[in-house]
Amino acid sequence: EGTEEEEERYNNRAPIYAEFAKIVCISVVARNKDDSIKKISFCGDDEKQILSDFFQLLNSAPMANLGGHNVKAFDIPFLCKRAIINSLKIPKVLDYGTYPAWKMDLVRDTMELRKRSAFLSTSLELIASCLDLPSPKSIMNGAEVSSIYWESLNNAEWHQQKLMEIKDYCE
């Protein structure tokens, strides 16, 4: 049996390890044929269904590029590990192993772009602020998502409200 300090450390760190986590929301932004932008979110309690629906979108959409903040180092490996744990086939666009090195430019990562500056890392919040873009990251931060989700499970109505807050954060 662990100490209270060990338990707190586990609760704070485990959600960022795919082996111990659970995906409850995936949000993406897609460009329509008329160049308008739309948000698409997959959110709920069934992680395998969320991943399946997201992968179906990736497999069916003629995407030239994927993009995100720290997406190459965190999001894509995390999604792939959770896919394996859920016995799902990883979509080709996420499977780095299927691409030759010269085709990795299909994934744009703002963290990599910022690493070319004097600072080694830059938060998504700072990038959004510099570009004068709104950021929902003020609602909560990534470290809070796990506890908000798990603590809301005891009350169905509150749980749905918290899932929508997590969705807003992800978008």
Where are the predicted features?
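Catalytic micro-motifs at enzyme active sites that drive phosphoryl/nucleotidyl and oxygen chemistry
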Residues: 13-17, 54-55, 67-69, 95
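Short, basic/hydrophobic alpha-helical segments
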Residues: 48-63
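Metal-dependent phosphoesterase core characteristic of DEDDh/y 3'-5' exonuclease domains
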Residues: 21-40, 61-169
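Generic alpha-helical structural signal
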Residues: 52-55, 164, 171
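Short, flexible loop segments at the rims of nucleotide/cofactor-binding pockets, characterized by
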Residues: 41-46
